[in-house]
Amino acid sequence: MRQLKILVDMDDTIEYLLFAWVDCLNERYGLSVKYSDIHEWNICTAFPTLTAEQVYAPLVEDDFWTTIKPIPDASEVLQWAMEQGHEVYIVTASAYETIKSKMENVLFKYFPFISWKNVFIAHHKQMIRGDILIDDAPHNLEGGDYVKLLMTANHNRSYDASANGMIRVNDWHDVRNCIVAVAHEDELKEGLAEHKENPVDYLKNEWGFVNLLPFQAILLQSMLGGTN
């Protein structure tokens, strides 16, 4: 098994920033915007009556970060990955004003097994070396030299992940599948060669795969000579 360096975004990848953000703005300004109304990375387009300063104000308020909840299974999968011997690093583009509250009220509260030593603050995530990056923002994945896992969110549903060398993952079970596939690539190729007639049964019974699409994408990319 390959020991991997796994890079992980925070907002809307391991925790629900957008849900809390929309709720906060609705309550503060008497609005009724829904999470499903967010179709773009620029959240301001969903709040046309507010200024950008009003929209982004909650992010620099310490109390706001106490309302953020973790995404299901994110903690369990990341802890499992570390127990498997993989290195897990949080890579967040957070503003410096939010770091202390965000770390204390979100990351270290819900992911206590992750150390501050394993946190990178970076806006240009492509400059950080790793084997996998999991992120909901396509622009953070584009151009990076790693397996690119795009976490599905409302703002990226229309983005063509596969055309841009990315694998779309819908939840943390998909992420776990991808980690297994990358770490055990050679073993899986060999096993599939021996089970050409029933590859799906082999993957389900021997490796526990349920959603095979992320795995198939990674395998195809590796067979073609890379992950870009």
Q: Where are these predicted regions, by residue range?
A:
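Structural recognition of alpha->loop->beta junctions
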Residues: N105-F120, G165-V180
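Short, surface-exposed acidic-centric catalytic microdomains
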Residues: S32-M82
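Substrate-recognition element of Asp-dependent hydrolases with the DxDx(T/V) motif
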Residues: W65-K69, A74-L107
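Active-site neighborhood of HAD-like aspartate-dependent phosphohydrolases
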Residues: M1-Q54
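Phosphate/NTP-binding elements of NTP-utilizing enzymes
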Residues: L188-N228
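Conserved Lys-Pro-Asp/Glu-containing loop-to-beta segment of HAD-superfamily phosphomonoesterases
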Residues: N118-D145
